[in-house]
Amino acid sequence: MSPCENDPPINWKRNLIVAWLGCFLTGAAFSLVMPFLPLYVEQLGVTGHSALNMWSGIVFSITFLFSAIASPFWGGLADRKGRKLMLLRSALGMGIVMVLMGLAQNIWQFLILRALLGLLGGFVPNANALIATQVPRNKSGWALGTLSTGGVSGALLGPMAGGLLADSYGLRPVFFITASVLILCFFVTLFCIREKFQPVSKKEMLHMREVVTSLKNPKLVLSLFVTTLIIQVATGSIAPILTLYVRELAGNVSNVAFISGMIASVPGVAALLSAPRLGKLGDRIGPEKILITALIFSVLLLIPMSYVQTPLQLGILRFLLGAADGALLPAVQTLLVYNSSNQIAGRIFSYNQSFRDIGNVTGPLMGAAISANYGFRAVFLVTAGVVLFNAVYSWNSLRRRRIPQVSN
């Protein structure tokens, strides 16, 4: 009998609350610096419109690129050493990097630190893996849906707080404040998260081929990874053109930035409301039904976005789209839980994070390229086509299987 087996049972609901708080803090920390990132790039000596645009895009994207590369390594280490340790590593590492960002003297230092931020990240996928391995399987949809709202809440609050702090104290102090938030996350995780984990030696670890063979349906798991990528591509493709599209719809108004900010935020608000409820519904009727329905609903909302005539119409459609999006990633994660074992949960969720990061990089590039060649409205139609392909692909993958019966 291992020492862990003598410990009292873990209160997974308490861990869920603490993990939610950790995801909220890291989501807020990441988005705090987003509103003024181009301004900081300019402050570091980059001048000229084209150079500023190029460097802003590079320093934004490089974090996701290096996160995609590093996630599988951290996932494997989580399966060997425990998920709590990876949460602590991520929060502390990102906190230190944020301090160094506030001290950067030129664009190359900042670029390297943004890459390092991606390498040391991984709080959210490891939080997902931790909760997925502790929660009763018939509550996975609700738990993972609830957990997803933590990061969304932080990402909604972060830009507003970051903009206010930058206006009040300047750009560099915001990095130090962000570091403080991440250090707080470190201590909350250290003292409040509980995990019973028996470390696994490197020799006992399943190798990649064994991980694949241990999956109940490897092709389905791969299709879920692809679904995650396409979800992020669809979300990111609209980001580069949203403000310009709103300006085109609004005409000659003075508060176009405020209107754009509102329209950018409403999907997150809708996702906050929908994710736990649709996750709970998925536990009852099956997450695969939620996934396919939400994908089809997304297609039906993206198409009319190409034909709207006012910002209000766009805002309403974006709100409804956010409600559908709030169900997508939790449904994918729940299906990953159903089709993998706790022994490899860290790697499975980290692979999924890698696909998500690739989508975060490619989505804005796709949106910018389409809008440059065919106009803003074409972006919504092409994105709808991509999501429709994903719906058909996911349905084809899911129809060959049944969700196994789950129990407490």
From Swiss-Prot:
It comes from the Bacteria. GO terms for cellular component: plasma membrane. The keyword Acetylation does not apply. Disulfide bonds: none annotated. One of its GO terms (biological process) is response to antibiotic. Gene3D superfamilies: MFS general substrate transporter like domains. PROSITE patterns: MFS. It is a multi-pass membrane protein. The chain crosses the membrane at residues 16-36, 58-78, 92-112, 115-135, 146-166, 173-193, 224-244, 256-276, 290-310, 319-339, 378-398. Its main location: membrane. Keywords: Antibiotic resistance, Cell inner membrane, Cell membrane, Membrane, Transmembrane, Transmembrane helix, Transport. It is found in: Cell inner membrane. One of its GO terms (molecular function) is transmembrane transporter activity. Belongs to the major facilitator superfamily. DHA1 family. MdtG (TC 2.A.1.2.20) subfamily. Confers resistance to fosfomycin and deoxycholate. This is Multidrug resistance protein MdtG. It comes from Escherichia coli O7:K1 (strain IAI39 / ExPEC). The lineage of its organism: Bacteria, Pseudomonadati, Pseudomonadota, Gammaproteobacteria, Enterobacterales.
